């Protein structure tokens, strides 16, 4: 790879600091042995420290559009804290505590300042992808004793409603990012070891029994693998559709993973056919049309509610009485928190990253951003720390290594 040799490998000290920063951002994987409140305190401290360290880089004037978009997303997020104070009476401190995880994006400016080598970044991606698998297996071995993952009430709960033990905690996006990296490396280097790793990562993704993550990961995989052969691409799409249709005629045990997930999907489709609006459509309509108090909050956002404030209790009441959840609608949450300004910035970032030209060796960064563009429709993945760090790495790689756009070239994803 012929890249500008401005990048350097992380030193041992930097590796220690970056791993600590990541684990803190992940809130120690919400380990059940720690107090739910205490594990959040380091996050509130490390974000400002990272911000101060990167301040000169943050205010640096550059014409790079990706850099500018990341900067303005951070600015719009900070503005939303004050919006919640002015229009909802939520204190600045509670506003910051509610949205601190959303400021993990400042990691991008550390990367831009330090310019670590691609080798360091890819090693980092593999480390946290593998670490999630190890922790997940450990949590499985301890079932039914809960190990990782607090719910919104500060309690740990495993779900067995989908045909197998469903243990989900922060780090799933790190797993998906590592999968895309493995897949990309296999198709570039043709080393079977990366194919084996990619298959293992995908099996772990399936074992998360989260339909949307499986769907969008598989879709991006199909597009990437068959991008150069349109016939195979179309056949693959037809195969996926046929598999979905056959799912209604093939009988699976209701206790099996496949049977349970098909049943859940069919129940949702049945509700739609009976005239019952899909819950996420209802949520999107509500949060886009009924949440904001005035035109100003429509533009700059309302900020993120904290459970201890009256603003947060308003959201809790909505969840309990109408079963409408802000975390269910990624773009709805972006609009509520940062308004039309933030929504425009995020969409511009996602779309630009999906259309940008990248070297074949770094295509995993683009694969992840395409995945995120679609996955964020039905969940607020963009606001999760693991997703934000993966975003930072992907956008950083695109900022530094993007190829020049070709004139009169047909637009393609890969």
Q: How would you name each of these model-derived features?
A:
Residues 1-264, 320-413:
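Hydrophobic transmembrane helix bundles of membrane-integrated enzymes that assemble
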Residues 274-338:
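Long extracytoplasmic/lumenal interhelical loops at the membrane interface
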Residues 155-162, 172, 266-280, 295:
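Luminal/periplasmic active-site loops of membrane-embedded glycosylation enzymes
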